[in-house]
Amino acid sequence: MTFWDIILYTVSYFGLFTAVFFLLTLIENRNQIKNPRPPQKLPKVTVMVPACNEQDCLAKTVESLLSLDYPKELLQIIVIDDGSTDKTLRIARGFEKDGVLVLTKPNGGKGTALNLGLKHATGEFVVCLDADSVVEPDALKKMLGYFRRKAVMAVTPSLKCTEPKTIWQRIQVIEFLLGVYLRKVFAYLGSIHVTPGPFTVFRKELFDKHGGYDTTTCTEDIEISLRIQSLGYEIENAVDANVYAVAMPTFNTTRKQRVRWYKGFLENTQKYKHLLFSRKYGNLGLFVLPSAYLSVILATVMVSYSLYVMADKNYQRFMNLYNVNFDIWRLLEFKWDIFYLDQSPLMIIGLAALAIGIAMIVLAKRMSREKQSLTLNYVLFMFLYLPLYTFWWLNAIHARIKNKDVGWRGRKRKEAEIKYA
């Protein structure tokens, strides 16, 4: 057995073990998937919408909040304009007649906008909704029932993509659905480590007791979730409380977003490094966070090996053709036989992993009541995601080492994004 064989078996075993473990966790807890009933006496909820140069998306976002199936007298909506240079503030003020509170401030980043919103929040619970996202009318009620347990400080929704139109958006549809699946599994394991910006619900007392959003990180949603975990509180998930965000439509915008997410993960896991390998924090510290790091290493090794094998085989094919003066007609005489099929253990493991991957997507689709067709999206994801994932992580590691600013402060949407907003 060669060195590369050992690496491949290690990668394959880790991937298959993790996938089976997560699947069994979901099956074991299948009777708990249904959301608890919301309280009979509904609490007051504040929804904060931080917005910077979101003139093309903001109106739909606020309209979705005004359409929530929730008593209007118990719903406070705050739009915080973070120094926009377009028509965002004007659009926001157009909703003041509907009772929306509009605040404005110089540009300082999402965390500073949310902290301003917290100062004006009057609800027992607070929600952040990104200005490029829309929420289904029944989402809020589906989430509130989890707060019957005092230990629960946050409840996450199912974050999904709007209708995809580009290759990159189709890949993200599957990526987001995997996130839906994993977030529910992580909830059962007590290991949710990202509270998505679109429509995570928090107890306001969390911020009153332990401070507001961290304004020094590019991913405040990761920081606040790790802070909650480190304080010994819990984060739950309502798998069919659907929120839809506009997926990045181009290669470059997708890359920038993922680099920001991954760099933020590196920053915040370093900040909360006491969580890693700690028995005190259970599955999160002993398995989920270490596995996240290990998956990056193994993915990089796998992609590197695949590129090496591909280059080597293509070189061998070229030399074979060169030696027969590029006489390709003989290739047409090839007769296929079933014995040419690869029957190695690696192939069997690979097929098993593929089957489990499909099962994960199907389960996520059913649990979150997703209706769009996924076949083409999954094919694109299967062939393109792993090299893209590795590329994004290498970019993020480089940005972390160089301490590059990857935030989107004051950013304006490109024309390609506006087209799909």
Put a short name on every predicted segment:
Residues 43-46, 76, 223:
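Cell-envelope/extracellular polymer assembly enzymes that use nucleotide-activated donors
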Residues 24-43, 275-286, 316-421:
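Juxtamembrane C-terminal module of membrane proteins
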Residues 225-243:
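Catalytic donor-sugar/metal-binding loop of nucleotide-sugar-dependent glycosyltransferases
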Residues 106, 111-113, 123-124, 137-217, ...:
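Long helical/loop segments within the catalytic core of UDP-sugar-dependent glycosyltransferases
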Residues 81-89:
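A conserved acidic beta->alpha catalytic loop
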